[in-house]
A protein has these predicted regions:
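C-terminal motif of bacterial Sec signal peptides marking the signal peptidase cleavage site
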Residues: 20-22
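Hydrophobic core
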Residues: 10, 14-18
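Bacterial N-terminal signal peptides that target proteins for export
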Residues: 1-9
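N-terminal catalytic scaffold of extracellular/periplasmic and nuclease hydrolases
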Residues: 27-189
């Protein structure tokens, strides 16, 4: 199970790490880098395009494409040329239209749960261990950064276990008790 979670994390990091670079204008990056087998990475970043699917990727390709009469084409994003790509089924245990709580729980733990539930099994009372907790237990430093509030469902799925994504107090208390090394979040404008 741990190998499945680490493999899933690697694929997600690989897929989304190019999103920011692929969406920027400018010269193409020609740095191919190197990968050394057996050597552990110093840093691992997981970037989540919350709500992003093939439709949003295509919209970015169209936006960055060519709309000259007779020469219409899309512009491929950098991550679209990666040698490996992954796609995930995003329905949760109760809905074909899931929310951020259940999908982030699935990404962080490998378990599907109910919409609105963070870090708990289908019974809504059994906490399930997430990848950040596993890595912290291995002695790695953990930082969680978000453009939304840090107690939002997506970042919270990497440190909290609550039956309701609206339990902001419980989420905040678990953040403080997590022992993680760094947290930073944005705010939601209304």
């Amino acid at each position: 199970m741990r190998k499945k979670i680490i493999s899933m994390l690697f694929c997600v990091v690989l897929l989304f790490s190019g999103l920011l670079a692929g969406c920027t204008a400018g010269e193409q990056n020609t740095n191919t880098g190197t990968f050394v087998l057996g050597k552990a990475p110093k840093y691992v970043f997981m970037l989540i395009g919350d709500g992003m699917s093939a439709v949003q990727i295509n919209a970015a390709q169209v936006l960055n494409g060519n709309n000259t009469l007779g020469e219409i084409s899309t512009n491929n994003l950098l991550f679209a040329s990666f040698p490996a790509c992954g796609m995930a089924t995003t329905h949760d245990s109760t809905s074909f239209c899931p929310d951020s709580a259940s999908t982030a729980t699935a990404m962080s733990t490998g378990y599907k749960t109910h919409s609105g539930v963070i870090g708990m099994a289908v019974d809504k009372s059994t906490p399930v261990t997430n990848i950040a907790e596993l890595l912290k237990a291995e002695g790695m430093k953990i930082g969680i950064i978000s453009t939304v509030t840090i107690n939002h469902a997506t970042p919270a799925a990497y440190y909290a276990h609550v039956a309701s994504r609206s339990d902001y107090y419980g989420i905040a208390m678990q953040m403080a008790e997590s022992g993680f090394d760094f947290f930073a979040g944005g705010e939601i404008s209304k």
